[in-house]
């Protein structure tokens, strides 16, 4: 009789562990889809999207988020920002903040998470700062597209 109780307890624990793992996997999929949507809003290429997802999975696996809000938008934005830096497609934090929900995630939270990522993974260390020419070229291209669209209307 005692063995049966222990077996039942073991089954309950196994079910609980399976449910936790399933929930973790579902949460990860939801985060990756949110990151995909953020990247699409910024107009990023697929290589940057994939690199950002890999950074997030790496951070999730090494438990960088322990003690913090695990699935905060700041961590997603930090992954996108560092992926852009590493792929030499510079962005500024303000641009990234625009897709994160704006007022929800302040620059200080995003910068803090970027610092944590840089400390743990040594990413983004040997890359220069964002140059004004890169930003000007991208923003002028966007303005040109807007003026041609408005003239067609």
What does each model-identified segment do?
Residues 1-153:
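Non-catalytic, interaction-prone regions of core transcription and DNA-replication machinery
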């Amino acid at each position: 009789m005692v063995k049966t109780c222990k077996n039942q307890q073991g089954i309950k624990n196994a079910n609980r562990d399976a449910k936790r793992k399933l929930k973790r996997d579902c949460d990860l999929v939801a985060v990756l889809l949110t990151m995909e949507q953020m990247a699409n809003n910024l107009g990023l290429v697929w290589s940057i999207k994939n690199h950002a997802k890999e950074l997030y999975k790496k951070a999730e696996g090494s438990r960088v988020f322990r003690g913090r809000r695990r699935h905060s938008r700041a961590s997603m934005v930090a992954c996108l920002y560092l992926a852009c830096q590493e792929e030499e497609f510079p962005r500024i934090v303000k641009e990234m903040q625009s897709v994160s929900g704006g007022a929800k995630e302040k620059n200080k939270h995003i910068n803090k998470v970027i610092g944590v990522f840089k400390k743990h993974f040594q990413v983004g260390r040997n890359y220069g700062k964002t140059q004004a020419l890169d930003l000007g070229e991208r923003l002028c291209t966007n303005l040109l597209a807007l003026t041609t669209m408005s003239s067609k209307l």
